[in-house]
C-alpha cells in the first residue's frame, strides 16, 4: 500500500509569476480551503514566494477545483503527486526552493500556517504527519548544515539592502506587521542597533509582546498610526498581508526616506514621492548569497532525501495507529450497548474490560509488526479486522 499515492500538490511560485500575482492567487486559495478543507485533508502555504495547496485523498474533480483558482496561470502551475509532492514540501521547508537558498523565514511560515490550519481542522490525518515530517526535515537541515548562515530570509536581505543606502544606527525605523517575517525583521533591526524601533500590528497585544523583548515601541496598525510613522521614521518596512494598500500616500512634511514593501500582494501604492524597495529589487542580492550557499545546499538535499526515505514507514505506522484507534472506538461502542442491554450497572464496565483484554494483545502485535519493519503486513491485518463488521455485533445476528 502506497500511502503517499493519495498526496497531490498544486504549485505556483515566484519562478512563474510576480509576488503581487501570488498574493492575489493566495486569496483565492483561502476561499478554496474554507470550502474543500472541511471535506478533505488540506494544507495551503501562502508566502511572498509561493502559493501551494497540498491535498490528501482528493478526487480529480476536487483537485481541478483547486487548479481553477489558478486558471489565468494555467501554463505556469504544476500539479505533482505522490512522493514528488512530498519531496517538494520537504525541500520548501528546508529552504531549497526559496529565492534565497536556505532562508529560515520559510520554515517559520510553514510552521505558522500548519499550526493555524491544524487548529481549524483542515490539516489532519496522514497529511498532518507529512507536514510535521517536512518541518522536522527543515529543522534538521538548519541544525546540521551551514545553509542558513548569513541572511535569514528576504526580510534580512531587505535590511542589508537598506543599510547600503543609509546608516540604520542613526535611523528611526517602523515595522508594519508582527507575523513570522515582521517579528524577524524587528529582531534583526534591534540587534543592528537602530536609533528607534516601532512595531505596528492589528493585534496590539502581539506587537507589545515583541516590543517588550526588543526595547521597541508598540503601536496599533491603523491608517493614522501608519501616517504618523511616515512623519517620524526614516525607514518603514511593511510585512503586512492586505488586499488594500497600507501606504497609499505620503503626507506633506514626512521624513521617511525609504519604504520597503515585503507584503503579498503589494501593500505600498506605486508612484509615491519616496524610494520604495520591492521584492523584485532583492533578486540580485538573493542570487549572490544563494551562490555562496550551494555547497551547503548539497548537504541539505542529502538530509531531505534521508528524511523522505523514512516517510513511507512513518505513514504506515501512523495509518495503523489511526485504524486501530477507530477499531477500538467502535468495539467500545458495541461493548457499552451490550452492557446497557444486560441491565446491570457493572455490565458496561465488564464489557469494556473484556474488549480491552481481547483487542489489546492484537494491538500490541500490530505495533510489534510495525517496529520490526512489517508495516505492510500490519496494514493488511488492520484492513481485515476493519472489514469484519459483523464480528463486532454478533449478538445482533
From Swiss-Prot:
Binding site for NADP(+): 177-182
Active site residues according to the UniProt entry: 48
Reactions this protein catalyses: (S)-4-amino-5-oxopentanoate + tRNA(Glu) + NADP(+) = L-glutamyl-tRNA(Glu) + NADPH + H(+)
MF terms in GO: glutamyl-tRNA reductase activity; NADP binding
Known pathway: Porphyrin-containing compound metabolism; protoporphyrin-IX biosynthesis; 5-aminolevulinate from L-glutamyl-tRNA(Glu): step 1/2
Magnesium as UniProt keyword: no
Keywords carried by this UniProt record: NADP, Oxidoreductase, Porphyrin biosynthesis
Site (described: Important for activity): 88
Matches recorded under InterPro entries: 4pyrrol_synth_GluRdtase, 4pyrrol_synth_GluRdtase_N, GluRdtase_CS, GluRdtase_dimer_dom_sf, GluRdtase_N_sf, NAD(P)-bd_dom_sf, Shikm_DH/Glu-tRNA_Rdtase
EC number: 1.2.1.70
Binding residues for substrate: 47-50, 98, 103-105, 109
One matching Pfam family: GlutR_N
Origin superkingdom: Archaea
GO terms under biological process: protoporphyrinogen IX biosynthetic process from glutamate
Family named by the database record: Belongs to the glutamyl-tRNA reductase family.
Domain notes per entry: Possesses an unusual extended V-shaped dimeric structure with each monomer consisting of three distinct domains arranged along a curved 'spinal' alpha-helix. The N-terminal catalytic domain specifically recognizes the glutamate moiety of the substrate. The second domain is the NADPH-binding domain, and the third C-terminal domain is responsible for dimerization.
PANTHER family per the UniProt record, alphabetical: GLUTAMYL-TRNA REDUCTASE
Assembly behavior: Homodimer.
Additional facts recorded: During catalysis, the active site Cys acts as a nucleophile attacking the alpha-carbonyl group of tRNA-bound glutamate with the formation of a thioester intermediate between enzyme and glutamate, and the concomitant release of tRNA(Glu). The thioester intermediate is finally reduced by direct hydride transfer from NADPH, to form the product GSA.
Biological function: Catalyzes the NADPH-dependent reduction of glutamyl-tRNA(Glu) to glutamate 1-semialdehyde (GSA).
Name of this chain's protein: Glutamyl-tRNA reductase
Amino acid at each position: 500500500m502506497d500511502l503517499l499515492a493519495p498526496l497531490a500538490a498544486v504549485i505556483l511560485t515566484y519562478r512563474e509569476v510576480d509576488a503581487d500575482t501570488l498574493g492575489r492567487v493566495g486569496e483565492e486559495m483561502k476561499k478554496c480551503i474554507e470550502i474543500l478543507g472541511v471535506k478533505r485533508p488540506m494544507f495551503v502555504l501562502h508566502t511572498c514566494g509561493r502559493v501551494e495547496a497540498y491535498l490528501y485523498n482528493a478526487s480529480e474533480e476536487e483537485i481541478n477545483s483547486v487548479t481553477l483558482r489558478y486558471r489565468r496561470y494555467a501554463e505556469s502551475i504544476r500539479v505533482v503527486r505522490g512522493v514528488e509532492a512530498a519531496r517538494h514540501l520537504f525541500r520548501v521547508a528546508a529552504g531549497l526552493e526559496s529565492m534565497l537558498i536556505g532562508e529560515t523565514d520559510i520554515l517559520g511560515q510553514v510552521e505558522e500556517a500548519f499550526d493555524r490550519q491544524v487548529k481549524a481542522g483542515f490539516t489532519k490525518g496522514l497529511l498532518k504527519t507529512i507536514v510535521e515530517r517536512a518541518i522536522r526535515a527543515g529543522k534538521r537541515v538548519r541544525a546540521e548544515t551551514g545553509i542558513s548562515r548569513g541572511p535569514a530570509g528576504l526580510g534580512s536581505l531587505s535590511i542589508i539592502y537598506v543599510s547600503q543606502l543609509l546608516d540604520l544606527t542613526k535611523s528611526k525605523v517602523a515595522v508594519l506587521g508582527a507575523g513570522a517575517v515582521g517579528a524577524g525583521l524587528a529582531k534583526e533591526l534591534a540587534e543592528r542597533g537602530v536609533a528607534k524601533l516601532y512595531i505596528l500590528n492589528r493585534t496590539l497585544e502581539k506587537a507589545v509582546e515583541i516590543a517588550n523583548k526588543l526595547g521597541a515601541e508598540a503601536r496599533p496598525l491603523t491608517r493614522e498610526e501608519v501616517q504618523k510613522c511616515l512623519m517620524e521614521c526614516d525607514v518603514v518596512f511593511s510585512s503586512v498581508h492586505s488586499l488594500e494598500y497600507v501606504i497609499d500616500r505620503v503626507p506633506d512634511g514626512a521624513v521617511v526616506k525609504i519604504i520597503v514593501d515585503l507584503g503579498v500582494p503589494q501593500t505600498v501604492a506605486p508612484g509615491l514621492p519616496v524610494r520604495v524597495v520591492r521584492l523584485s529589487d532583492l533578486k540580485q542580492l538573493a542570487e549572490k548569497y544563494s551562490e555562496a550557499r550551494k555547497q551547503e545546499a548539497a548537504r541539505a538535499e542529502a538530509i531531505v532525501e534521508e528524511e523522505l526515505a523514512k516517510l513511507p514507514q512513518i505513514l504506515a505506522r501512523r495509518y495503523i495507529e489511526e485504524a486501530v484507534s477507530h477499531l477500538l472506538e467502535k468495539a467500545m461502542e458495541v461493548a457499552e450497548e451490550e452492557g446497557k442491554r444486560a441491565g446491570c450497572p457493572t455490565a458496561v464496565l465488564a464489557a469494556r474490560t473484556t474488549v480491552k483484554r481481547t483487542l489489546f494483545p492484537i494491538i500490541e502485535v500490530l505495533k510489534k509488526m510495525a517496529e520490526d519493519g512489517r508495516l505492510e503486513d500490519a496494514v493488511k491485518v488492520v484492513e481485515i479486522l476493519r472489514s469484519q463488521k459483523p464480528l463486532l455485533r454478533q449478538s445482533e445476528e
